[in-house]
Amino acid sequence: INRMLQKRYGMLQWEQGSGKTLAAIAMGLYRMQNQGIHSTWVVSSAISIRNNWDVVLPNYGLSYVFVENLEDLARIKPGDFVLVTLNKLGMLQRHIKKWIKRRHQNIMLALDESDEISNPHSKRAKSTLSCFRRCRMKLLTTGTSTRNNISEFAPQLELLYNNSINMITWCRTTYYCDREDNSINSENNAYYGRPIPAYKPGYALFSACHLPEKTTVFGMTERTQDIYNADELNELLAKTVITRTFEEITGKEIRRIHQVPLQFLPEERAVYRMVMEEFYRVQREYFASTGNHRKDAMLRLVQQITLLLRVAAAPNTLKEYNGGTPLKIVTAAEMTAEWENEIVAIGVRHQNVLNAYAEAFREYLPKRPLFIVTGSTKTFAQRRALRKTLRDSGNGILLCTQQSLPSSVNFEYVNKVLIPEMHFNNSGMSQFYMRFIRYTSTEYKDIYFLNYIGSLESNLLQMVVAKEKINLFMKGQDTDLNQIYDKFGIDYNLLALLMQKGVDKEGNLQIRWGEQQIA
């Protein structure tokens, strides 16, 4: 914090549960009391503002204003913390920008969960940049500045430095993809030694320097997990970001990640094979047509992947499934039953999968209290109240969607976590499982990933590992894949289990089994 106070702009990339909120409060108080700042504006997602900041600030007896309408702007006094959600910022953008301009930009911005503006084309990113890019002091806090690829860091960098001399591009070479043979070619950087320009030209330049786009089938584009001009990017990160892991801040590593590989039962493999090889039979059962043949062709592979992952999560959610309770759900119930006196948390990603697990747990463990949480059924206040109810149960089961506990709703007393349905990156999953791992925690936390080996979940796990390598680079840790495999508890040949994309005899896209033998 001392190092960050010596600069006007910076980012704290501290892992979830490490005290970013307290650090932002300390910096805001110091700036207002000693450096003449009028007020500290805290901007974040609605759940973070309401469940965290709106609770923490009154607990410390600090003066603050929660901006929910225009009248609230008139109540702001010097020395106040000002809370604004990203959605409300978009609605009041013009008025907030005018208010800040009248105070000569003499405020401090604390953007909590700054990866929320990683998409430069989103309304929340545009409104945040419009209102705060010129303010005097800026602090960005996040658990991970990138989720999927390097280019997501560009809007956060632009917000910090406002395209000034602090963000000069020193990359002599830019890269682009040749549309004809899909190869990566290089050329001299026309902006070498100049600040990265604002908005779209700047995002395009940042991407060309560090992560060129590749064109795929149907003209769609993809971003890989590669890094170009890594040394130049590392220099920029070194002066901007202070990174600390949970272990470095708390002095203890209490996380233990375990993989639970499972084999498909015959009935499960049959429905999985049907979706993989005869997707045309069930496509319209689960996905509506857009009315445009070209769009339907573009979406076909994406829809097939989505349905394959749904089969892997809960095969009994498909009408074509003829078996009993799926092995993954039975395994989750058996593991929960073994922890008879433990509170267990289970996080899935979709409502229909959650319903399948809820039905099974009511059948197999009728005496255990079951608490179901989704974003649509539980309000912020109810989720806060659940903390005490779940603790008092002694051995309750918290079954929830991972999105319903993304930030600021903490259950630090839960030690067993099951994740039967993976996210597309570890950043999304860690936002969930770090709700149970806080700097005040003292006991070991066991996190179990339940995966069907030989299914598309193996590919998803490999993609999570590849993206985590990028995230670790952004945190100043240049590691190889073997170390990340160890971190995730992967002790089997994952690469041999990956499914592959190919074409059939008629030239149509097709998903195929990997090197593994399927009985």
Task: List each model region and its residues.
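Conserved helicase ATPase motor motifs in RecA-like P-loop NTPase domains
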Residues: 16-17, 135-150
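A conserved SF2-helicase RecA2
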Residues: 424-430, 437-518
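Conserved RecA-like P-loop NTPase helicase motor core
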Residues: 368-463
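Conserved Helicase C-terminal RecA-like lobe
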Residues: 5-6, 15-19, 23-28, 32-33, ...
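Conserved Walker A/P-loop ATP-binding site and its immediately adjacent core
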Residues: 21-23, 36-59, 150-152, 349-352
